[in-house]
């Protein structure tokens, strides 16, 4: 279907949304990378949580894409960065914290710019996304702090113990 080309008063919002889309796609891929490495190491809870967050980031990508299309923009599905090959859990959490901080800052800026452009829906979308990213940030901070408090061996052993206990009780699920 051919789109009618007109001057789009929402071009600023479309650009912000596409920038966010690239970040969400890249972040989803990064967290999926972490998920498979935690799973391979036998850390079921960490793996499942990372998978859930990766899927949440992909849902964000879909929401952003839907908004771009509604505004009659063109969706750019290119990830904004290449997946980093990180295998150390502390470094995984540190990088995730860095990603979430950066994303929250950019979403707060985008919300402000969208409001200035009189695009209240995109403004609210960025505010809502920032809230979800703050939840991810809180999780990553807590896990990193636990890892630092307990030390690598104890923290990861607790992850394995929790998995074994849950499996024995039939509580491990998606």
Predicted regions and their residues:
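Iron-associated oxidoreductase/ferritin-like identity signal
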Residues: 1-174
């Amino acid at each position: 279907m051919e789109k009618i080309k007109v001057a789009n008063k929402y071009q600023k919002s479309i650009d912000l949304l596409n920038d966010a889309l690239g970040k969400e796609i890249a972040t989803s891929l990064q967290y999926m990378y972490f998920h498979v490495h935690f799973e391979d190491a036998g850390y079921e809870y960490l793996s499942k949580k990372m998978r859930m967050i990766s899927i949440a980031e992909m849902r964000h990508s879909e929401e952003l894409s839907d908004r771009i299309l509604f505004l009659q923009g063109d969706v750019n599905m290119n990830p904004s960065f290449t997946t980093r090959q990180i295998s150390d859990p502390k470094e995984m959490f540190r990088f995730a914290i860095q990603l979430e901080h950066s994303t929250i800052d950019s979403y707060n800026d985008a919300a402000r710019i969208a409001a200035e452009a009189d695009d209240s829906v995109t403004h609210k979308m960025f505010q809502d996304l920032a809230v979800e990213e703050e939840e991810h940030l809180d999780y990553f901070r807590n896990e990193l702090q636990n890892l630092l408090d307990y030390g690598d061996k104890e923290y990861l052993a607790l992850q394995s113990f929790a998995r074994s206990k849950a499996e024995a009780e039939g509580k491990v699920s998606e």
